[in-house]
A protein has these predicted regions:
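A short, acidic/glycine-rich surface segment
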Residues: 31-32, 62-67, 103
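N-terminal beta-strand motif that seeds the catalytic metal site of vicinal oxygen chelate
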Residues: 1-19, 75-84
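Helix-adjacent hinge/juxtasegments
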Residues: 55-80
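Conserved active-site tyrosine of GNAT-family acetyltransferases
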Residues: 18-23, 94
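Conserved acetyl-CoA-binding loop of GNAT-fold acetyltransferases
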Residues: 24-30, 98-101
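Short glycine/proline-centered loop/turn elements that form peptide/ligand docking sites
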Residues: 17, 35-39
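Vicinal oxygen chelate
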Residues: 34, 44-47, 53-54, 82, ...
């Protein structure tokens, strides 16, 4: 069921500074910031040869990333994204195995126009 690693998402307190660090110090290809209001974040994708890193900064006071950064002021890994062939079948299988799907359980549209779901971090 699990496919390739799509990206590792890192919450950061300063998106501009983190982007500059990846571009200048590490020579990475850093994309332009894009607001994702449905998810309460501004994101920047960093292209790597085998996957991507997604930097996340809060967008608005209700952002889940704002709450994450309040608990982890320096930032840190927020989630790992895997690709699956059928997101609804994967959701149903994981729920049957006891995983908790966050939100209303239905996919939202992610940063690249693909459907996404989030599982509880302890699952």
């Amino acid at each position: 069921m699990i496919g390739r690693l799509n990206h590792v998402a890192i919450a950061v307190p300063d998106l501009e500074a983190a982007s500059a660090q990846y571009a200048n110090a590490l020579g990475a290809k850093v994309g332009a910031p894009q607001d994702e209001p449905d998810h309460g974040v501004t994101v920047v994708f960093i292209e790597l040869p085998n996957t991507k890193i997604e930097l996340l900064e809060p967008l608005g006071e209700a952002s889940p990333i704002k709450a994450f950064l309040e608990k982890n002021p320096a930032g840190g890994i927020h989630h790992v994204c895997y690709e699956v062939a059928d997101i609804l079948a994967a959701r149903d299988h994981l729920k049957a195995e006891g995983a908790r799907v966050l939100g209303d359980g239905n996919p939202k549209t992610g940063a690249h126009g693909k459907p996404v779901l989030f599982l509880h971090p302890k699952d």
